[in-house]
Design a protein with these regions (language model features):
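N-terminal secretory signal peptides and thylakoid transit peptides that target proteins
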Residues: 9-37
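Residue-level detector of intrinsically disordered terminal segments
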Residues: 1-5, 15
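Beta-strand elements within well-structured catalytic alpha/beta cores of enzymes
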Residues: 56-61, 90-95, 181, 202-215, ...
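Flexible, glycine/proline-enriched loop segments at strand-loop-helix junctions
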Residues: 64-66, 125-133, 154, 182-189, ...
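Long, well-ordered alpha-helical scaffolding segments within enzyme catalytic domains
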Residues: 74-84, 190-205
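A short aromatic-anchored loop/beta-hairpin motif
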Residues: 27, 35-40, 47-150
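Surface-exposed, charge/polar-rich loops and edge strands
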Residues: 177, 185-187, 198-208, 215-311
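Internal, conserved structured core segments that host functional sites
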Residues: 139-193
Length: 311
């Protein structure tokens, strides 16, 4: 899959993001996927053991890549959260930074590479490697679980910063297998929620389903230099985050899928790339599972760092 590095001020642009792997992924996978998909689906779907309990679902507001290096309230909460969660057999990550068009991909690598999909940051950030193994067998389980659309296995991606910058704090030993699922950016919000519903079956196989994005994300409207804090610097950001929190409290999934109707949505979700991972997590959570707030607050004034656990 062809990749390009992006400056963080551009990494929420759909035009830029969809070029990440579009040529290689769509030409070699989506356009010629039939034979590949049939071959993959014919493989054994053996999982890596049966867990003693159903795994939770989590959503993480990942914010800036610099959080990988930071020691702040957000990263300290991630570190503590990793110790509270039951140990998974594997992690399936749906990151805002792997977008595709017309197809959904899943990483099949034995050893997924660490992707530094950003620019303009200190060398120390580019030096980070998160050497978690992949899990092709459970990736094949994901192919079989998703009924909404064909899912194509691919070797052409890895772990982008939406995944590894948070896992570095959650699971610093990088000893839990990780694989990613792409977001088909041509599809509406209801589609992403429905795919999340399909992915719920993996929870019973020991998989921790993780969405990584931000429920409020508009890089052109951030207030850089604003200290991290509990409240947003702009009313539209606070209003939308509060609306999401209220809908979660009542598990009003319908309102969260129809997010455009929530207060401040036009600015808070100027592009939906960072909101869609939240819908995968919401869908993978049972409708009766309470949403537990793990962390809430804002970085750069308007980036919601809200983190949620279901189950």
């Amino acid at each position: 899959m062809t990749m390009m590095k992006m400056h963080p001020s551009e990494d929420s642009s759909p035009a830029m993001q969809t070029e990440l792997g579009r040529r290689g992924f769509l030409m070699s996978s989506a356009l010629g996927a039939t034979a590949t998909l049939a071959a993959l689906c014919s493989l054994s779907n053996a999982a890596a053991g049966t867990p003693g309990r159903r795994l939770p679902v989590i959503f993480i507001g990942h914010g800036s890549p610099m959080n990988a290096l930071a020691d702040n309230a957000f990263t300290r909460r991630l570190a503590a959260w990793g110790k509270e969660l039951p140990r998974p057999s594997a992690i399936l990550s749906v990151s805002a930074h792997w977008l595709s068009r017309g197809a959904t991909g899943v990483g099949m690598q034995e050893r997924p590479k660490t992707i530094h999909d950003f620019g303009g940051f200190p060398q120390a950030l580019f030096d980070i490697d998160y050497p978690a193994p992949g899990h092709p067998a459970l990736a094949r389980e994901a192919i079989g679980a998703v009924k909404q659309t064909p899912v194509v296995g691919t070797q052409q991606w890895g772990l982008d910063h939406g995944t590894w910058t948070v896992l570095k704090h959650l699971y610093p030993k990088a000893d839990i297998p990780v694989f990613q699922l792409s977001i088909d950016y041509d599809k509406p919000a209801a589609f992403h929620y429905a795919v999340g519903r399909d992915l719920a079956a993996l929870r019973d196989k020991g998989v921790l389903v993780m969405g990584s994005g931000n429920v409020v994300h508009n890089l052109r409207a951030t207030d850089r230099g604003t200290p991290d804090g509990p409240a947003a610097s702009r009313p539209w950001a606070q209003g939308f985050d509060d609306a999401v929190k209220a809908a979660l409290a009542g598990r009003d999934d319908r309102a969260l899928v129809a997010y455009e109707k929530l207060e401040g949505a036009a600015t808070a979700v100027a592009t939906p790339d960072h909101y869609f991972p939240f819908l995968y997590a919401l869908g993978a959570a049972g409708s009766n599972e309470r949403a537990k707030t793990i962390y809430e607050g804002f970085q750069s004034g308007t980036l919601s760092m809200r983190c949620i656990q279901f189950g």
